């Protein structure tokens, strides 16, 4: 598990670089020690954007000879093994240095108020791979490698023996001296070797210092305040005169440690945030936000005192105003001024960005609503017009009228509809028609025919328009059979009996086009429409009346058709018409588009051109057309259709008590193997 966490640390560092944080990380420090010392400051900055972030804390003890003890604090137990992976990757990538890390001690830190787990790492430098851009060459060999391992193990043992005896500030021995004596790197320092020059005396007057640094506090080991900047005295009255301890005026917000010199010295390289206590503030300031000071703690060994160099922890003009402060209270050299002004601009940009995001979200919601409404409109438009015609109208193009050489038109109406309307309430008529038309509309999808219009009880559909297909007659015929079945499910509101419909079908050429601008309709024109209407008006209740051309279109297509005979058709003269009885190759479920369970595993096509398992459709076995003729005298004879016994029908029943001397009962079946009308592929 430790190896996995270490590997995760290495990849986490690579992920941070890929996410664009590499420039920020490179500027934290000029060497590994400075890099680690400033990690807490980076976490403090990131916490402004990620308020839920719970970052660990790091503290470094170092010596001039290249010694390092890394203290890791976290309230997440078991994740300390990620640290070596991150630190070693940083040292190799940013500082071209190979380091090895091992754990010296693990315990619970009692001096901290937040981060509980305290892990001490020993950081040992292996060898310099590159110093200031120049390659350092060193012979490689088994002896050197063995010596390095022995030196590393020896250093580790010495550190484990001496670690717990290291004193911390304050003490007789300075903190840096203790670390320098205990932790030694044998391969060179991790810090630069620059040596500054200090003056023999401080050339700054006390008053000038307090004015130039208006926010600073000097306190001793007992937390007694010895010195304070002018603005500290202004906003924390009595801090010098009342002789109270500093921890009575302030509490430490970050890092989460107890307020004493020992704890502060342990985190001397961390950024400190102090907050005034409300109970110590004057009554006039208790209602205002408490003053927060952010800065650095510096231990002065010769004076045995700590100085806190700080600035007001405000991020915007609004916070500055709420604290009853002004920009003039902040020293001109203090970058807090620039931070407040820049952050104010950033807040304004963020506000604009938030408003933009809000508007984008509103626009997205409106776009979704518009898409939904557009889809509803298109659905309604496609219900009124053919899809390709509707698309042309949406694009603003004119739809040219089209001539179709052959198509099949169907008309239907309700028998005695006028009498039903006279005996019922209007709402009953509406409910009856709505129930009937809903069933018919579903059948148009099953058989893929186009519904042209409905006027009162009249229902008109066409096959082969607006998309020409060879199977238009079969589709309309199957639709008519489905209409006849569906009509039996709709009750007459007067008698309570199933309603009866008349259906007429005719095949021929038509002219089709869009008529009207305000409410455009797709209409059919030509004598074919008139003839189809005449077939319906001259039909009989519960019968599907066929014209001669419709009969020819359905011939040899697997339908049972009965010859009605010659009748007088208004405006057409005498015509020989027929009645459509049934589809010999399809069941009622297939006609109605109902799902049927598979029986013998054979695949057949359904009226909706869908393939599913179903019993085989009966076929003619002798592959020859069989025509049976008779007259009323021998109508009782039994005949065989498509190889199955069918009882002979009385011709007077066939025409509903309107016999004709020329009437002949004819049954036409397919010669040879015939595909069902529903299996035609467009």
Swiss-Prot record:
Further remarks about this protein from its record: There are two types of guanylate cyclases: soluble forms and membrane-associated receptor forms.
Gene that this polypeptide is encoded by: Gucy1b2
InterPro entries listed in its UniProt record: A/G_cyclase, A/G_cyclase_CS, H-NOX_domain_sf, Heme_NO-bd, HNOB_dom_associated, HNOB_dom_associated_sf, NO_sig/Golgi_transp_ligand-bd, Nucleotide_cyclase
One GO CC term, this protein: guanylate cyclase complex, soluble
Stated name of the protein: Guanylate cyclase soluble subunit beta-2
Record's signal peptide: none
The organism of origin for this protein: Rattus norvegicus
Tissue note: Kidney and liver.
Enzyme class, broadest EC rank: lyase
Regulation: Activated by nitric oxide in the presence of magnesium or manganese ions.
Entry keyword GTP-binding: yes
Cofactor(s) it depends on: heme
């Amino acid at each position: 598990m430790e190896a996995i966490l270490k590997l995760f640390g290495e990849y986490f560092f690579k992920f941070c670089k890929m996410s664009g944080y590499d420039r920020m990380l490179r500027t934290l420090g000029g060497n590994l020690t400075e890099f680690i010392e400033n990690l807490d400051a980076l976490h403090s900055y990131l916490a402004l954007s990620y308020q839920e972030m719970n970052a660990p804390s790091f503290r470094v003890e170092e010596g001039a000879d290249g010694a390092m003890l890394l203290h890791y604090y976290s309230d997440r137990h078991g994740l300390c093994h990620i640290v070596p992976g991150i630190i070693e990757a940083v040292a190799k990538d940013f500082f071209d240095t190979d380091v090895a890390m091992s754990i010296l001690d693990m315990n619970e830190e009692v001096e901290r108020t937040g981060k509980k787990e305290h892990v001490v790492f020993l950081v040992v430098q292996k060898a310099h791979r590159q110093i200031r851009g120049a390659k350092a060459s060193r012979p490689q060999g088994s002896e050197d490698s063995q010596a390095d391992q022995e030196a590393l193990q020896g250093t580790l043992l010495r550190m484990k023996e001496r670690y717990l005896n290291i004193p911390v500030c304050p003490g007789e021995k300075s903190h840096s001296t203790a670390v320098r004596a205990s932790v030694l790197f044998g391969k060179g320092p991790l810090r630069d070797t620059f040596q500054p020059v200090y003056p023999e005396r401080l050339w700054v007057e006390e008053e000038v210092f307090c004015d130039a640094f208006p926010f600073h506090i000097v306190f001793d080991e007992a937390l007694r305040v010895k010195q304070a900047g002018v603005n500290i005295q202004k906003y924390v009255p009595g801090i010098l005169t009342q002789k109270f301890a500093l921890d009575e005026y302030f509490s430490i917000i970050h890092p989460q440690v107890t307020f004493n010199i020992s704890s502060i010295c342990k985190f001397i390289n961390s950024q400190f945030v102090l907050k005034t206590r409300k109970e110590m503030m004057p009554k006039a300031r208790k209602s205002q936000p408490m003053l927060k000071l952010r800065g650095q703690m510096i231990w002065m060994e010769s004076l045995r005192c700590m100085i806190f160099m700080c600035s007001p922890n405000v991020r915007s003009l609004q916070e500055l105003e709420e604290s009853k402060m002004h920009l003039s209270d902040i020293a001109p050299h203090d970058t807090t001024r620039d931070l407040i002004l820049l952050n104010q601009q950033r807040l304004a940009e963020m506000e604009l960005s938030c408003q933009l995001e809000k508007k984008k979200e509103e626009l997205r919601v409106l776009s979704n609503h518009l898409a939904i409404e557009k889809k509803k409109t298109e659905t309604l438009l496609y219900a009124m017009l053919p899809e390709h015609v509707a698309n042309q109208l949406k694009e603003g193009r004119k739809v040219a009228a089209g001539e179709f050489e052959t198509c099949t038109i169907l008309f239907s109406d309700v028998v005695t509809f006028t009498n039903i309307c006279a005996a019922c309430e209007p709402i009953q008529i509406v409910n009856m028609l709505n129930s009937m038309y809903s069933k018919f509309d579903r059948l148009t999808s099953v058989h893929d025919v186009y519904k042209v219009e409905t006027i009162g009880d009249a229902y008109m559909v066409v096959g082969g328009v607006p998309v020409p297909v060879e199977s238009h007659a079969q589709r309309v015929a199957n639709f008519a059979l489905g209409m006849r079945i569906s009509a039996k499910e709709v009750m007459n509101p007067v008698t309570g009996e199933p309603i009866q419909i008349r259906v007429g079908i005719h095949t021929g050429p038509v002219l089709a086009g869009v008529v009207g601008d305000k409410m455009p309709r797709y209409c059919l024109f030509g004598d074919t429409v008139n003839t189809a209407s005449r077939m319906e008006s001259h039909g009989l209740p519960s019968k599907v009346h066929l014209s001669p051309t419709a009969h020819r279109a359905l011939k040899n297509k697997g339908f049972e058709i009965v010859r009605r005979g010659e009748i007088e058709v208004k405006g057409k003269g005498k015509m020989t018409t027929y009645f459509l009885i049934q589809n010999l190759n399809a069941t009622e479920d297939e006609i109605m588009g109902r799902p049927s369970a598979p029986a013998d595993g054979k695949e057949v096509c359904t009226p909706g051109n869908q393939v599913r398992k179903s019993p085989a459709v009966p076929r003619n076995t002798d592959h020859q057309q069989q025509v049976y003729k008779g007259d009323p005298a021998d109508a009782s004879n039994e005949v065989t259709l498509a190889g199955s016994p069918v009882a002979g029908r009385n011709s007077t029943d066939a025409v509903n008590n309107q016999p004709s001397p020329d009437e002949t009962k004819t049954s036409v079946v397919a010669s040879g193997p015939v595909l069902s009308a529903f299996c035609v592929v467009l």
